[in-house]
Amino acid sequence: MFLTSSFCFDNAEDMRDAFNETNDHNIYTRFSNPTVQEFTDKMVALEGAEAGFSCASGMAAIFGTFMTFLQSGDHILSCASVFGSTHTLFTKYMPKWNIDYSYGEVNDVDSWEALIKPNTKMIYLETPTNPGLDVVDLEKVGKLAKKHNILFCVDNCFATPNLQLPIKFGADLVIHSATKWIDGQGRVLGGIVVGKKDLIREIYLFCRNTGPSLSPFNAWVLSKSLETLDVRLERHCDNAEALAKKLEGHPKLGGVKYPFLPSHPAYEIAKKQMRRGGGLITFELKGGLESGVTFMNALQMITLTSNLGDSRTIASHPASTTHSKLSAADQLSVGITPGLIRVSVGLEYIDDIAGDILQALEKC
């Protein structure tokens, strides 16, 4: 582990050449670090990309990508259902640089072409979406982006490269919050963007000067975590699918959503582009906001926190937490209903997970 802020040189000539980029000597950990590069190389290989750059968090990777390729007067087209902080970037911060955005319906990609403008420079989406678990057709969007020569960027956090490979469907760049499934135990923050070498070079130049660098210690943790990603995801998927099937049709629920349930609106698309359905499920409590709070307070084993992808099962109520700053109308526009519960299904025994949820539902 190279836990250092900077690197030493044997002589002035080597130092000069490093700054002139005529040798590959590391200079400063904000620029590059061998431990960080090891993690980056593993993620590049898993995604089938050409290159990558690791950041301090998933949001640092997203913002760094936006700022690298967008400028004043540009337009970005995104799926309507996005993570709360990404929505805040679009609505609060991007307008400061005169960057406009449009939201496309996640279940109607055919309507997206009408939203493309002459100044549209990027199509951005996440699939499955956070927190609604909508599935966006990567193949259709990839063809649309290629047709109009627009940069196509995918947040692959919920699926990981173990379950989904967006580059195969035409994505130019793939982003992860490595904090989630990549870490797998809720220990460290991290983010990464991978893709075409020339595009990553531009992101690197922006980020080395603005400073969203990944800690070498965090990179070491994440790199070690990748060694168990496959076996962990199998158990997460097994548990999530079993839980979704147990809860489907429960009288207290208005619906259960999981990409590999046949009842999911985009089930066929999910089967086409994902190896398995992932480790998250959502369900809608018929009692709305009040039932959501009651349910969360009634949980005994399951952890209440805003993270996901942990070894332990985690529940969250987006309407009162991650998306609480949105108006009721804005919440609905991105798929957040008052009684929506998101469950990141852990590695525990499935009967224990289901038992805790069922006893909490009895109190709603």
Spans of model-derived segments:
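Short amphipathic alpha-helical segments
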Residues: 24, 50, 189, 218, ...
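Conserved N-terminal alpha-helix of the aminotransferase class I/II PLP-enzyme fold
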Residues: 9-60, 85-92
